[in-house]
Amino acid sequence: MSELSRRTVLISAAAVPLAGCGKNPANAPYVPPPAPGQKLVAAADVPVGSGTIVDGTLVTQPSAGVFKGFIARCTHAGCALSKVIDGAALCPCHSSTFGMDGQVLRGPAMEPLRARAVKVSGTEIVAG
């Protein structure tokens, strides 16, 4: 077996921490905001106390008939939120969770989700 050179050892040692600096595969590419009036989801498809993620927007219904919109990106590292379970939007990168009002339920995120204007148009939720 051949001995490793000092250079090979140093390069290998430096590469290990850098491996964690790459893009997280769960982090989806940038999604531009929807155009005003663009249909996002049927109001009936957003349960009270829950939400859905569509076109980079988290649409929630925190209470009956009240709809809110948020940019579906974690405020910690910018990862795309992956899903809504039991009234919480989940970040797959570092496990932050957000309530249906956009507030942080569990960190490491410290800032609430950024609002995105949505409104009801007939039976649809559209970009505001």
Residue ranges and their predicted role:
Residues 1-21:
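N-terminal export leaders
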Residues 14-17, 22-86, 112-128:
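N-terminal pre-ligand scaffold of iron-sulfur
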Residues 88-95, 105-113:
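Short cysteine/histidine-rich metal-coordination sites, predominantly Zn2+-binding motifs
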Residues 102:
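Conserved catalytic-core motifs of eukaryotic protein kinase domains, centered on the activation segment
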